[in-house]
Amino acid sequence: MIYTGKLTGHEERRIAIVVSRFNALVTEPLLKGARDTLNMHGVDEHHISVFWVPGALEITMVSSQLAESGMFDGIVTLGAVIKGDTDHYNLVINGVANGVSQVSLSTNTPIVFGVLTTDTLEQAQQRAGAKAGNKGAEVTVSLLEILSLYDDIKQLS
């Protein structure tokens, strides 16, 4: 058998979106892309919960609480970390990426990583709905596909 994630059958999914307020000029369009994608694929608006956090580092903490609660089928994480002149950029992005991955694996909750890492604000804006598409929408499609595959795997056992 060959299995591939489907973008249908998600009407009853409960989805959490954890989004950073820092760099809101970028994260607000990412959030819009994620919500529009969920709506387009039939997820009931009442089943979408948005959790604003101060910055990218807080994404992991809140995602962990949400995953452990068992209230959500999947989680979308959104943020924008723009490189500066210090090593802070590397510390933040490595911490968030590793943390989100660990939470997903330890709780068996699908969590997709939509935290942009760019050199400039302009690059981030391009990836948040301008010329380079909307990464919030893209990672949300990935989440729906993964949730569908999880369903397929459960049916195998």
Swiss-Prot record:
Keyword Signal included in the entry's annotation: no
Organism for this UniProt entry: Leuconostoc citreum (strain KM20)
GO cellular component: cytosol; riboflavin synthase complex
Protein name in the entry: 6,7-dimethyl-8-ribityllumazine synthase
Record carries keyword Cell inner membrane: no
EC number: 2.5.1.78
CDD domains, alphabetized: Lumazine_synthase-I
Top-level taxon: Bacteria
Gene3D superfamilies (alphabetical): Lumazine/riboflavin synthase
Pathway per the UniProt entry: Cofactor biosynthesis; riboflavin biosynthesis; riboflavin from 2-hydroxy-3-oxobutyl phosphate and 5-amino-6-(D-ribitylamino)uracil: step 1/2
Function: Catalyzes the formation of 6,7-dimethyl-8-ribityllumazine by condensation of 5-amino-6-(D-ribitylamino)uracil with 3,4-dihydroxy-2-butanone 4-phosphate. This is the penultimate step in the biosynthesis of riboflavin.
Gene transcribed to yield this protein: ribH
Residues that bind 5-amino-6-(D-ribitylamino)uracil: F22, A56, L57, E58, A80, V81, I82, F113
Membership in a protein family: Belongs to the DMRL synthase family.
